Every structure is written in C-alpha cells, then in structure tokens.
C-alpha cells in the first residue's frame, strides 16, 4: 500500500497501519496543512517502479530530524544527488552509522532504520549485520584465490545461501532477502 499526501509518498506498507498512523498525526495538527491523503493498494512491481522513479523531494516523511537524516542517507545508497538510480550496495549497521556521522550511535541509527516509513523506496533492506558482510567478503576473496578460480560463486548464488543472516525487517525476513536479491541482481 502506498500512502500519499498531496501526491507525495508518505509511507509504503503491507497494511493500513501506516495510513492510520499518518491520519492520527495529521488529526493532531491545529490547522490542516495538507489537502489530500490517499492510500492505494499496489503490487510489488508497482512499488519497485516507484522506487526507481522517486526522488527525495517526491516524499513527505514524518519523523525527527535525526530519523530524516538517517532515511536520507539510506535513500542515497541507491540514488545519486540528482535522484537518478545508482548501483546499490550492502552495508553493515556499524558502517552505516559511521556514514551517518554517528559511529557511537549504532543502536540509534538502527532504530531509525527500523522506523523507515517508505520501505523499498528508502532501501533499509540493504543494511545488514556486520557478520554477514564479513562472510560475503570472505567468500568473494576465496573465489579470487587460485584454489577456487573458475568456481561459480556469483553474488546471486551467494545471496541465496540460507546460512546468511540479513537481519530483521519490518516487512519480514523473507521479503528482505528477496529485496536484496532483486536489488543486487540488477
């Protein structure tokens, strides 16, 4: 479901919870600042299309300044400054906290990631546990060694490995794995 306020993306979720939360927030405002709130049920391909076309200014997000800063950094993982798509990459929570200039606040950054209202468009699924990053790098390094040269150890095949923990995701672990696979196979 895509929730929009005056045409701008406010949330993406699998149920009406995001719409209810936004409606409650808007109801608390003294004077209505927005004219139109809509919610549309869409399929995964539609959400992916929105993700590829949306720029940062196409969203209206409710959260603290810190949360918005974290969400912007997440958005920048898959988008250039001008909003055009760029090659995505997996990143650990600690490295992402450092990217947010908050190395000591990994938990605060992780919490803000978990509150991301526009999952998929703001790619919180690309942030995974450091142990998983280290494992993937280790396998890739082995693939470059003479012993494993010629073996089929592609990223696509590696991401299907059930032993890799990609971490929690508001929309479920299975969807997080599927999103990472789709993101990195493009």
List the predicted regions and their residue ranges.
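Short glycine/serine-rich loop segments
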Residues: 103-177
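Basic nucleic-acid-binding alpha-helical/helix-turn surface characteristic of O6-alkylguanine DNA
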Residues: 1-103, 145, 149-163, 174-186
């Amino acid at each position: 479901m895509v929730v929009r306020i005056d045409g701008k993306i406010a949330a993406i979720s699998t149920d009406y919870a995001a719409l209810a939360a936004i409606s409650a927030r808007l109801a608390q405002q003294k004077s209505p600042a927005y004219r139109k709130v809509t919610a549309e049920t869409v399929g995964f391909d539609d959400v992916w299309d929105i993700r590829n076309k949306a720029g940062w200014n196409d969203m209206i997000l409710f959260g603290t300044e810190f949360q918005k800063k974290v969400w912007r950094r997440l958005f920048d993982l898959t988008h250039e400054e001008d909003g055009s798509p760029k090659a995505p990459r997996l990143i650990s929570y600690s490295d992402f906290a450092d990217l947010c200039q908050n190395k000591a606040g990994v938990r605060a950054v992780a919490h803000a990631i978990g509150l991301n209202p526009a999952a998929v468009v703001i790619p919180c699924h690309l942030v995974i546990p450091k142990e998983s990053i280290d494992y993937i790098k280790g396998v890739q390094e082995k693939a470059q060694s003479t012993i494993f040269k010629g073996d089929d150890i592609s990223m696509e095949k590696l991401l299907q490995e059930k032993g890799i923990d990609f971490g929690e995701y508001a929309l479920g672990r299975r969807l997080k794995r599927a999103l990472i696979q789709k993101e990195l196979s493009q």
